[in-house]
A protein has these predicted regions:
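Extracytoplasmic metal-acquisition and chelation regions
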Residues: 1-154
Length: 154
């Protein structure tokens, strides 16, 4: 019975995520990161991931030509924010932000598993809301809270 309850919450979470992503204007359904982190989610929910350091650098070195290509790619992506791995952002991510004119997101999604001190559902809903709100969508916090409570009750 516990497993069935967990499955129901996870199915509800999947539907909720799709609804939140749908509030983001289609051109802005892109997550600009340093490294490939959200590939699975991007494919499942129909947004693009632009891992700029993975796509444009070799060995982590940011050359002037790479910075120019990254800036152009970000500008044309439609993204309203760059999502660094952590805050404060690295010097490289700050340079990319300045060069592209696209700001660093004020909040950072947790890209590696479950956030410390948070449940799986709290991590997922927080990450989705950070992305959706930064990209011009509207996140349904009330339903996110209900999902978190349902998960905690299992």
């Amino acid at each position: 019975q516990r497993r069935a309850k967990a499955d129901r919450v996870l199915v509800s979470l999947g539907g909720w995520i799709g609804q939140q992503i749908a509030t983001v204007p289609e051109k802005q359904r892109v997550v600009v990161t340093g490294h490939r982190t959200y590939d699975f989610m991007a494919k499942r929910y129909g947004f693009r991931e632009l891992p700029v350091l993975d796509d444009y650098t070799t060995g982590g070195t940011l050359r002037p030509s790479s910075l120019s290509a990254i800036s152009k790619s970000i500008k044309t992506s439609g993204s309203k924010a760059i999502f660094p791995e952590s805050l404060p952002p690295s010097k490289t991510m700050r340079r990319i932000s300045r060069s592209s004119g696209v700001p660093i997101a004020k909040q950072v999604p947790f890209g590696d598993g479950q956030a410390p001190g948070k449940s799986l559902i709290q991590t997922a809903t927080s990450n989705v809301c950070i992305f959706v709100n930064a990209q011009g969508g509207r996140c349904d916090q009330e339903t996110a809270s209900q999902l978190q409570k349902r998960w905690a009750a299992i």
